[in-house]
Amino acid sequence: MKSLETKLFDHLAFLYGEEKAPTITERFLRLLKEFRAKHEELVISIPSEKVSERDSILITYGDMVTKEGEAPLKTLASFLEKYLGDVISTVHILPFYPYSSDDGFSVIDYRRVNSELGGWEDVAALSKSFRLMFDAVVNHTSSQSAAFQGFLKGDPDFQDFFTVVDPDIDLTRVFRPRATPVLTPFETAEGTKHVWTTFSADQVDLNFANPDVLLEVADILLFYAANGAEFIRLDAVTFVWKEIGTTCINLPRTHRIVQTMRTVLDMVAPNVMIITETNVPHEDNIAYFGDGTNEAQMVYNFALPLLTLHAFHNADVSILSDWAATLDLPSDQATFFNFLAAHDGIGMLPVKNILPLEDLSDLVARTQSLGGYVSYKSNEDGSKSPYELNINYLDALSDPDEVKKGIDHLDELNINYLDALRNPDAPENNIELIAKRFLATQAIMLALRGVPGIYFHSIFGSKNWTEGVEQTGRHRTINRQKVECVQIEAELNDPTSLRHHVFTGYKKLLKARMSNPAFHPYGAQEILSIQPSVFALLRTSLD
């Protein structure tokens, strides 16, 4: 069996060539030696399981719940301890670093906490009650970061940190997750340069073809481990390696980058788990497991949200069940990160070749009829196609025909729609029914093999925040509402509220999962075929 040091050399030789690999490897080893000396406690591998049926991960922004005069991270900690301390093991704080756009995903400084949220002491306080998951937003950095500002000023240390491309070069094969140009012109000390920007003009891609970039990213990951991260989410990692003439996603060197990160952590922080966020077709997504021991310990199960939504809209679980039957694990060291909702929209690309195009079109139309939005991406031929559905998952389950009937009836009676929400007899205002329907989807996610990821607005029964979209002009804001602590607590304590019904029901599901070893993330799973309207599975404990 190869030593981890040998594996590290092999990865770096694959990425940068045999000639450069010895020098680059030596630089990595110096970094790891220094880290090991400072953090001996992290080097000790805990023999017990890293995750079990008792684990679930709450996904939240650091300021999702606020209280006047208090640092949001402090408010979040006390709120979560009070309401979820007995059912949630881990908190995934979405990017809490200083940023310039995209709600945190355009990082200015990876090693600081956004002062508007609190400080590292608040993160440490949260870690006393929960395990922590951090974001590594390392495909790109903010145009306001010190590195990119240095690049613009001609600082030689940063000239190769970003990918500069001649705008006349044909980039039509490059996969685009957005409808924006892949290159953005910037004025530098040396004139205009066109720089690679996968997601927006403010999010400038890092150049991993430069080993200095990978070394810096490795140092950032180790910094996160030293500050309490037991799980690290690699945001948009599928885009990190660029090769002109290819799609620039899921390339062999992309996987080697992830494998290098895994090896680095295995060498000095072996209890930290990597979770890859790769919003791509299912077969490409699960490739980030590697051989089951050398890449991500968990991958986002991106096809699950839309397939579950499709099953409920069509009252037919056949496609969902057939797909779920293929969810094999490559080893006893890797499993799925199951989720139905998060801060982003519901991805459509993961179900490519699983759902018929007609069904996808129906889901798009249904989302729009329910007050949601659709975000588009550019295609190779210049056309655009739906990339994600932007809608709260609870609202996405509604019946648009019933909603329309209700609105039409209100118009006839000259009743304001918001006032009518108080009418429990309206088909789409039956709170108990809405909660049960929503919890049925969550039960599927919680029962499947893997570790559940639960979005804040799911467990607390939120709905579309259309006012937020109007405020920001961004579709994703519909599912990113920040709530005042006093308001949400009042609703949670009101037995007639939707939040109360969803929250109390969700906690019952989590307690049932936690108490049964059959729901272990690595336990056996068999999908049962009973009838099209019933999703059934058999879970078996490891022993």
Q: What spans do the regions from the language model cover?
A:
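Alpha-helical packing segments of well-folded alpha/beta enzyme cores
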Residues: 119-122, 126, 213-224, 257, ...
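Loop/helix patches that line or flank the sugar-binding groove of alpha-linked glycan CAZymes
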Residues: 330-543
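A structural motif
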Residues: 88, 229, 450-451
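Short alpha-helical segments and helix-capping/turn motifs at coil-helix boundaries
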Residues: 43, 72-80, 118-121, 133-134, ...
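An active-site-proximal structural segment forming one wall of the substrate-binding cleft
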Residues: 210-232, 325-330
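Hydrophobic residues within beta-strands of alpha/beta enzymes
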Residues: 91, 232-234, 454
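Acidic/aromatic-lined carbohydrate-recognition and catalytic surfaces
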Residues: 2-210, 214-215, 226, 237-312
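Glycan-recognition surfaces
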Residues: 156-170, 259-384, 408-414, 479-484
